[in-house]
Amino acid sequence: MSAATEPTKEKPVNNQDSDDEDEDIDQLIEDLQSHHGLDDESEDDEHVAAGSARPVPEELLQTDPSYGLTSDEVTKRRKKYGLNQMSEETENLFVKFLMFFIGPIQFVMEAAAILAAGLEDWVDFGVICGLLFLNAAVGFIQEYQAGSIVDELKKTLANSAVVIRDGNLVEVPSNEVVPGDILQLEDGVVIPADGRLVTEDCFIQIDQSAITGESLAVDKRFGDSTFSSSTVKRGEAFMIVTATGDSTFVGRAAALVNKAAAGSGHFTEVLNGIGTILLILVIVTLLLVWVASFYRTNKIVRILRYTLAITIVGVPVGLPAVVTTTMAVGAAYLAKKQAIVQKLSAIESLAGVEILCSDKTGTLTKNKLSLHEPYTVEGVDPDDLMLTACLAASRKKKGLDAIDKAFLKSLISYPRAKAALTKYKLLEFHPFDPVSKKVTAIVESPEGERIICVKGAPLFVLKTVEEEHPIPEDVRENYENKVAELASRGFRALGVARKRGEGHWEILGVMPCMDPPRDDTAQTVNEARHLGLRVKMLTGDAVGIAKETCRQLGLGTNIYNAERLGLGGGGDMPGSELADFVENADGFAEVFPQHKYNVVEILQQRGYLVAMTGDGVNDAPSLKKADTGIAVEGATDAARSAADIVFLAPGLSAIIDALKTSRQIFHRMYSYVVYRIALSLHLEIFLGLWIAILNRSLNIDLVVFIAIFADVATLAIAYDNAPYSPKPVKWNLRRLWGMSVILGIILAIGTWITLTTMFVPKGGIIQNFGSIDGVLFLQISLTENWLIFITRAAGPFWSSIPSWQLSGAVLIVDIIATMFCLFGWWSQNWNDIVTVVRVWIFSFGVFCVMGGAYYMMSESEAFDRFMNGKSRRDKPSGRSVEDFLMAMQRVSTQHEKEN
């Protein structure tokens, strides 16, 4: 905007004073080298999707920059496009709490509570209700603590804006900005809406870290897009608003987050699946019991007591509580390793992750620009090259960009250049010029010689030298070849030249810069490969930079431009080809937020469990969509809120450590679930047959105690010594059910033998003395408690020593069960010590049989083939379905654009 068209200011706008004194160069270098890069800015300019969910017609974006909109036009546009704020859906917390009482296991527990109340069995009623509320409370608290992502996104937005209305500069609340408004941008302004720069010949720098997580300010010129929640770091300009509210980039990110959060978690689906099958088995067993009871004309009260007993034992009432406790203990352990778990089910998901979609900056690299080996023209001293490059830099700490900081910090390797630098006096400094693409400084040497130092785009620096005198062909060719080589490898290269006194320009060389890989990343990537984890890089950097980083890290170099994916429409490839393309690629460069979301979605549709790392607002949708969303060190609040796990330690190694721990936790959960399903099947089979054949059942109070003891003892599984699998682990439900069924049958046979051999008329094992309820209670408790020692081991039960917590918990429960049997608590008659010893010996025999059976099933390939435990990817891929779904998505996208 020219001075002639400058609008009248109704309210002055404060400008920050940047005319501070030059700082001492020695102090500046020492300061930079002592901070270890904490203030370094990243070179990775993450791209942000332009456009909006609700496009504004171009004719509404032809506002006169000198006059702005009229008040009437503002009113019309606000009525059409609404306020400049994100829509918010409030959630009823009470309804959310009630949702934790819905599910197959919960339904059975609720039915059992109603039955217990009807039978006036208040002890059982209280125990069941207590378990129900405990499960719901733990789940609700975990979900509530995750926080509101939309609230975090809204925190990044501006509160007010300076706009041109009716030819005047006025300050208005940010939510009153409308499409077509002309906004004034200057140092420190937080941009309240998406827009486009309309000031000709402008040059401003904008901090988009609230969106991308990247700290390096982005250069913007006339016609470039700006985005809501970004901050102007340097320069002044005017912009026209192109999108507001939900149609801005931040608004669309919030919408994608809500979309991603709509589905139920993977672990919830697994538990519901197990609960559904157990519910069906309970119904089948109850039908058998009811038919037998009606045949014998049992009274309704007796039938209801049988029903209550089957209902209590048929479903593992403590399953949610034990699994939640196991994950909570694991989360506390991860917290010690600086990994904060915000969603407990993420631990289970992380254990099964096969593909990690990782950002580059800060995770794979140091997020710290550094100087690589400089290229010097023949005959030039490297110290002269370094000295000239550092002379062409600001002496103000606030004026230093990331490249200047990298050069100054590298002086530690060039002591002669560092010593000479302090002897030069800065006469003039001209910051980066977007037209000439170079930085210029005029200095005075200790001898009083005037020297012009320049650094900038290599070919522009070369042109500056050639304008004065020709360069030898071999020097020019070698220089250009080196620049081309560095560009192909993804380095950011700067040419350096100088002019001493009245002499000619001298081309000195090229300074290559790059964000280097972290020291431990290559080793960690190799370790990840051995753990069966594929790492795909998703970065906003250029393809060359991505490929060079992958080469240094030992990752695959099949890196493609994300344009081939398309934005929302999937590009031009058929759905099946697109899925193959994403599956086989090692990563994508120049990605937009929608690309990240699409990559995660496509891999999930192929049956993979996917983890995604991110640190910016633009990562929030894909973090929420992924099976495990990981917010890396330094992430924005919105990214942290969207993530399942937040890492406080930098680098990929922290993620790999957490993955190992999660696999240990998964092993504990898997062994418990096998154990607990076997227990439910055991009592369903035994009690169902006992009731149907002999019209008898255990005392209902003892049934409740058996259910409680089974879970109380195994709560300590959360502290057990567990190995981690060398490959991703998943819920192979067919194999799990096969093992549980066989173990349950062995347990039922053992209990049936106890029932039918210990109470024969003449000379039974217990010689017809004592209480059948007490004996059965002890035998069931012992064999069930000991089963956990079998399922927890990766090999034979003696191959792994359990933790003292688990051993102690089982021993305490066994002692209590023995006291029940000895003193006849809730079983009417006491039993002598000989009876108890015989039950212990017999139970150990059953334990050994179960141990042998479990080991054979674990090691048997034939059993695996029989159970056919395959993942979704082993099934026909359904390529025609993928093609159809992608075609429908493109039609939907095109329809949205047309409307």
Swiss-Prot record:
The segments annotated as topological domain Extracellular are 118-121, 295-305, 720-735, 827-838
Give the start-end ranges of region Disordered: 1-72
Q: Which GO terms describe its biological process?
A: proton export across plasma membrane
Q: What is its EC number?
A: 7.1.2.1
Per UniProt, Mg(2+) binds at: 615, 619
Composition bias, Acidic residues? 17-29
Q: Which residues lie on this side of the membrane: Cytoplasmic?
A: 1-96, 142-272, 329-700, 756-805, 856-899
Q: What is its main location?
A: membrane
Which transformation does this protein catalyse, written as a reaction? Answer: ATP + H2O + H(+)(in) = ADP + phosphate + 2 H(+)(out)
Class of the enzyme per the UniProt entry, highest EC level? translocase
One CC-aspect GO term: plasma membrane
Among SMART domains, the record links this protein to: Cation_ATPase_N (SM00831)
Description of how activity is regulated: Activated by high pH or also by potassium ions when the medium pH is low.
**Which CDD domains does this UniProt record tie to the protein?**
P-type_ATPase_H (cd02076)
Keywords in alphabetical order: ATP-binding, Cell membrane, Hydrogen ion transport, Ion transport, Magnesium, Membrane, Metal-binding, Nucleotide-binding, Phosphoprotein, Translocase, Transmembrane, Transmembrane helix, Transport
Q: Where in the cell is it found?
A: Cell membrane
> Which PROSITE patterns does the record match to this protein?
ATPASE_E1_E2
Active-site residues, record numbering mapped to chain: 359
Return the InterPro entries for the record.
ATPase_P-typ_cation-transptr_N, ATPase_P-typ_cyto_dom_N, ATPase_P-typ_P_site, ATPase_P-typ_TM_dom_sf, ATPase_P-typ_transduc_dom_A_sf, HAD-like_sf, HAD_sf, P-type_ATPase_IIIA
Kindly list the GO molecular function terms attached to this UniProt entry.
Answer: ATP binding; ATP hydrolysis activity; metal ion binding; P-type proton-exporting transporter activity
Its record classes its membrane topology as:
Multi-pass membrane protein
Q: Which branch of life, at top level?
A: Eukaryota
What does the similarity note say? Belongs to the cation transport ATPase (P-type) (TC 3.A.3) family. Type IIIA subfamily.
- Recorded protein name is Plasma membrane ATPase
